[in-house]
Amino acid sequence: MEVNPPKQEHLLALKVMRLTKPTLFTNIPVTCEEKDLPGDLFNQLMRDDPSTVNGAEVLMLGEMLTLPQNFGNIFLGETFSSYISVHNDSNQVVKDILVKADLQTSSQRLNLSASNAAVAELKPDCCIDDVIHHEVKEIGTHILVCAVSYTTQAGEKMYFRKFFKFQVLKPLDVKTKFYNAESDLSSVTDEVFLEAQIQNMTTSPMFMEKVSLEPSIMYNVTELNSVSQAGECVSTFGSRAYLQPMDTRQYLYCLKPKNEFAEKAGIIKGVTVIGKLDIVWKTNLGERGRLQTSQLQRMAPGYGDVRLSLEAIPDTVNLEEPFHITCKITNCSERTMDLVLEMCNTNSIHWCGISGRQLGKLHPSSSLCLALTLLSSVQGLQSISGLRLTDTFLKRTYEYDDIAQVCVVSSAIKVES
């Protein structure tokens, strides 16, 4: 009859504890009316309780700290800290002790041990302590694997390990929206506005230390989350930048292409990288967390082969008096164009000059500026339309209507220049 040998107990004991900040101790006040049967008994007990604040015993306030009673929650962007202790519970000396701590995520395995060198010996009732730190960068299941190997006095090599599983949760819900800027000089400009909606998904308030946008090399960014009051820059969220649980806050940024990219047509088109958000916050007792989004992308507006924009136009003009505008024509294609300009009158707008004139060849990513003259025969807000550009190489015509709007007033009203 075969008998299984008894399982050998290890000489060393492994303990793993998570290191977190303590919390403020709060008591539940129990009180009653003075004429009730207990009288002043409950009130006296609260006054004698060392965890209460004198004069505010019934407000659930406390000045004492309490250690965490459970593992708690771990959120993405926080620093996971753990205390690892290996204690010699036996009465003999153990040699060649090696403690290794690995963190297994869904995508990788990380070594968190501060040192990979073995300890020569460990006497009875002595211990080996280590503290590990790791900035959590993935959500989902994480497994802390602690392995211990050692050699007994008899020369037998022993090995054991323990697994500690925990979940990493998402602290913030970040949503982004892009808005193309609208200008008086062009129906679509290269400026883009980014709205970032940040929601606190935890169960405790957050102090938002920093929410910034790190732009890509093509853009300059301007934050629009503050206003000027009495010569000082004041946040639109007030002096206390706290974000309560499940609350949402909107941050706004304006991005404008740098000059070296804005002057080259065709570079900023299609899917372009805008940048990434860098968010830093603090929770209870100053525990810091940091989260960086992936590169934000947006679909740049399409201009077609030829882009027409206005560089200069007056806001108000006199009725039946000529005024001047400056147009910029940009070749956004990858081929050379031979352009002809045609000007078609409308019911209210009349072009002055020769229609059908040759503009010459326009190479890829190059531009030319045109000064045009026109007048309006109708008062009110008038839309400028009727420009036609024809590429003689492909016999293709590009139409431009509703380019801009101008306010036409009576000639008796003096227009400020």
Swiss-Prot record:
GO terms for cellular component: cytoplasm; cytosol; TRAPPII protein complex; TRAPPIII protein complex. InterPro entries: TRAPPC13, TRAPPC13_C, TRAPPC13_M, TRAPPC13_N. It comes from the Eukaryota. It holds the Pfam family TRAPPC13_M. GO terms for biological process: endoplasmic reticulum to Golgi vesicle-mediated transport; vesicle coating; vesicle tethering. Part of the multisubunit TRAPP (transport protein particle) complex. Belongs to the TRAPPC13 family. This is Trafficking protein particle complex subunit 13. The gene is TRAPPC13.
